[in-house]
Amino acid sequence: MLFRTIYNVIIEISFPILWIIGLFSKKINLFTRGRSKTFKILKSKSLDSNKWVWFHVASLGEFEQAKPLIIAYKKHFPKDKILLTFFSPSGYEIKKNFSYADCICYLPWDTIKNVNRFLDFCNVKLAIFVKYEFWPNFFKGLHKRKIPVYSVSSIFRPQQLFFRWYGVGYRKLLYGVKHYFVQNDLSKKLLNNLGINAVSVNGDTRIDRVYQMVKQENKLEIMDDFTSGIKCFVAGSTWPEDHNLIE
């Protein structure tokens, strides 16, 4: 109860602050102004008239994890409508025209009012959140409406707030997920230790996406000029542990 009270106070006061910061930051401006159009987009798509499957991702990297699932789902259930939401402008601005989704918009700020309005607009039959996305008011709203929530390509570490003694309020969110599809055995073990057993280890769906991209034609003139026929290895979004392997 205390966690939710503190969380909701922070959520309510933080968005007006972000609007002010947005006057001086292009990215934050996209973040706030983009959200001001969310309900207009939802209304134009008549999301209350069909049963929708909702995928939510934070940014571009998480989108790449969700993309193989969205495409596969659409191929198997072509009559179902796909709603895709983004948290960050770096994902939305690049992928807002993704053809396999029937409606694409920003995730509204996680206030109780926004959550209720969003779920009133959207006739969602199931929700799929990718990797690190756990939003207290959205999870509570989905639970109250008996809409199942799945967590895909999620990954957990002992250092995360969920597993700290002072993170008990945030930890409760984990019990609102119907099934976890996690990236590794450690994530499964951490969830199992909390009594959460609806967990499958499926790896990182981004591997599937990278494999698909490798099979495509990816020639770029600028890269051909840069490499001059010499083999070139490109790494991006790497972690320190990756650097040892690369070197």
Predicted feature residues:
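Catalytic cores of alpha/beta
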Residues: 241-247
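Active-site and donor-binding regions of nucleotide-sugar-utilizing enzymes
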Residues: 19-216, 234, 238-240
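A residue-level signal for conserved active-site and pocket-lining positions in enzyme catalytic cores
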Residues: 13, 55, 246
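Membrane-interacting alpha-helical segments
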Residues: 3-21, 25
